[in-house]
Amino acid sequence: MEEGCRPASTTDLPRIAELTRAVIEELSPMRGGAVWKAREARPEPLEDGLAALLDNADARVLVATIDGTIVGYAVVRLEYLADGSILGVIDDIFVEEGARQVGLGELMIDDLMTWCEERKCVGMDAMALPGHRATKNFFEESGFTARQLVMHHHFGS
């Protein structure tokens, strides 16, 4: 079994869109998932938004593969801050359930970190839903620490 990651191409867009739909389906029922879906999840048509990222010099889109088959993807973008510094923001990082725990997430995060460091980012941010312990642990094992908690008050039933 050969694992790897590489920059995405336009021919990968249908598969990345399929994986994006899978992550939206996986996260939506979790605590905080409904608001995440409405606010942060990629909107349809997914292929159009992903294609724009491929053409954006301030973004990097990766695919993770096992034996040449795409089983994951990641997206990071540069955010220019008020003080003139640059922050790398991981918008997506996802590996299909059956392909987890073999190091693909680590390959992608390492690539994204290198890419952001080369662009003189002061750091990187990533989001994990409350209670999604596996995601939190993954980021912590990669050297991330919490820097902000978002509090939410829901109205209605």
Task: Map each language-model feature to its residues.
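Residues that form or flank phosphate/diphosphate-binding pockets in enzymes
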Residues: S85, G103, A134
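Conserved acetyl-CoA-binding loop-helix of GNAT-fold acetyltransferases
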Residues: D92-V95, Q101-T114, N137, E141
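Amphipathic alpha-helical recognition patches that constitute DNA-binding helices
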Residues: R15, V89, A134
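Conserved active-site alpha-helix within GNAT-family acetyltransferase domains
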Residues: E106, E118, P130-Q148
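Acetyl-CoA-dependent GNAT
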Residues: E3, P7-T11, E18-R31, K37-S85, ...
